């Protein structure tokens, strides 16, 4: 028994060690379990044969699971893309948005190739910017430069920042005068074009590498000496360009230091080249003026267009698709004498073999589904169909949360799942949030693009973050005050002056015997339609059967707390068989919603109403953020945040406090402001003025009234109850 027997099938060296280890362990276990019963090792024993076949299958499985992880995330004909799994590139994750004046300057120089230089002045008292620019030589659309600068600025504008003016700079025009020698075989016209481009580039260089004081004649000369084709300079000057006829008293003098708005006079006629002498040896060479200008124009545009920006190369992680997910049954490796063929596979031994196959197949199927399991893309949202899959995917999303330092499902969102969000719905909401997390973190301080009135995809990043987190629509074009009117409903709050309507809505004539325990039926959960057409038919049925909706009025209490099925009861009445009633949670009183002879019918209607109110609550949730400084420069570092107060979640003190903490963390620290939780009546007026406020930036006819519209919005907010106002100032 101590004799070591070699396997009778020779394996490759890479796998044989693992196979031998499996075989050794198998024999030790069998020997230990059998004791003195099994005294001889025979390769043809059924147990040995089965063990060896299983060991071969495990050895093959080890090979299949030995590839890099990226290969298992690569599907056939679908290349590996890290963003699919929430693994954003380093350039997206660690990139910083526009913050400083230098950031804006570099951005505009990259995005607007028609300018060679610009000066940005920042007014700290108003948080506004003024831009003066220097045109690029040979610019053809000079009149469009201010429009392009304004457009680029507004695409990257931060909260509470605004653009005061854009104007052409008063440039200091310099004339190049020089005698220099070129190398043998060089074209003088081309070399002169290179010299002019070197000077232009130096005068408009990046501010992070050169300050105004360092733009000196000496530094420029060092750059010119490196120009291709230059042998040496005999003289080299940059003089202020003076028109002797208009300014006879001013003398042209060489400049040793250059201003930030300095630029170079480009020769347009031969007389402009009179003070430039180029030699090849001792021979003076001539310049072709037209070809010189063409060459210089080519150099200018070649080096100023966006396509020639220097980018840091990114290492692309690549995966290889592996066709390893098919399993060759262990039964196929067993001799025919065991009767394991497909025609005779119903015996217990075959079922025992099938258990091995099932375990291996199950593992391979899970490995094959790994791309869908870890994907956060919209097309893979339907993959999570079992509770186990949902738990596994939730853990992966938790990992992404920790990696990016965010919470896509904070505890205060989990506490009250009053809108019946399913586990799959929670996953989809978290996936949508994490798909955008790199952009949200990078552009956290970014404001709305004021030049785009169309609100789709155009909102402050703070609003996008908040709305994506709670599952609301992040566009400013979604007007929540239109939600209830679309369904022909009017919200009636208890604090409304028209309290007589409550007397009509409350069923005060309910017989007290109806409230006896034997006459009260709890409302249970009923499965409803999930498709759009099915929902529409159910809502039409609800509106037609429940007479409550004949009033077109709905109390705020019912609107909010009707999202909970426990607040509905079915009562046995005298005149009618059964009544569906709702008990107010915020004040005393009952509402008779309707009656029917069937408990099942009323129970189903209660479930339909509950789902209907959940959808309305969710649709009524949004956030508005506007910057008063855009109309009133005396309020430079202030934002006003407006939210509806009439939904279930938005009426809860805990939810409001946590929302304030989140928004405070998102709004830049130097910006203060207030949060207003306003009623539906206030929101209707506010949204009207807010849309007009946005229109003032694209409609010149109403732009003079911007400040008046701001005052109208602030007046609407002034009627907010003090308990519904929160400060973003943590010191308060």
What are these regions (language model features)?
Residues 70-92, 200-210, 638-644:
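A short, surface-exposed helix-loop junction/capping segment
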Residues 1-49, 97-214, 220-223, 266-532, ...:
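Carbohydrate-recognition loop of C-type lectin domains
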Residues 205-252, 257:
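Membrane-proximal bilayer-interacting regions
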Residues 569-589:
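Short aromatic-glycine-(Arg/Gly/Cys) micro-motifs in beta-strand/loop hairpins
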Residues 528, 533-559:
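Negatively charged, low-complexity tracts enriched in Asp/Glu with abundant Ser/Thr
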Residues 1, 691-698, 705-732:
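Hydrophobic/aromatic interaction determinants used to assemble and anchor large protein complexes
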Residues 35, 41, 49-81, 88:
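Single conserved position on a long alpha-helix in the C-terminal lobe of the eukaryotic protein kinase
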Residues 537-548, 585-604:
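A short, exposed loop/beta-hairpin motif centered on an aromatic-Gly-Thr core
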